[in-house]
Amino acid sequence: MAKLSLINREEKRRKTVEKFAAKRAALIAQINDFKLPEEERMVARLKLQQLPRNASPVRERNRCALTGRPRGVFRKFGLCRNKLRDLAFRGEVPGMTKASW
């Protein structure tokens, strides 16, 4: 089980990303619009740099929904490999069967 503080920090990041998503998208659109003068694009770059670091979606980390484990997380299920295996063996994951060939 991951420390509760790390799980809460990740949740706080997720909320920050959601809060600034529209503003970031607008600034990035300005930066990539080559029809605008260079000065306006530079101002947009500076405004983007002024946003909080945690507003960037790259800083988000996928964590297991049950344990908070940061590594080996399957996106489709939102679970780490260990818990996914346990639940699959108990038959609690619909459509998942043990491989045999």
UniProtKB/Swiss-Prot annotation:
PROSITE patterns, per the entry: RIBOSOMAL_S14 (PS00527)
KW Ribosomal protein (keyword) present: yes
Source organism phylogeny: Bacteria, Pseudomonadati, Pseudomonadota, Betaproteobacteria, Rhodocyclales
Keyword vocabulary terms for this entry: Ribonucleoprotein, Ribosomal protein, RNA-binding, rRNA-binding
Parts forming coiled coils: none
Function of the molecule: Binds 16S rRNA, required for the assembly of 30S particles and may also be responsible for determining the conformation of the 16S rRNA at the A site.
Any Gene Ontology CC annotation: small ribosomal subunit
Family label: Belongs to the universal ribosomal protein uS14 family.
Oligomeric form and interacting partners: Part of the 30S ribosomal subunit. Contacts proteins S3 and S10.
Gene3D superfamilies: 1.10.287.1480
InterPro entries assigned to the protein according to its UniProt record, in alphabetical order: Ribosomal_uS14, Ribosomal_uS14_bac/plastid, Ribosomal_uS14_CS
This protein's name: Small ribosomal subunit protein uS14
An example molecular function term from Gene Ontology annotations: rRNA binding
GO terms under biological process: translation
Keyword rRNA-binding found: yes
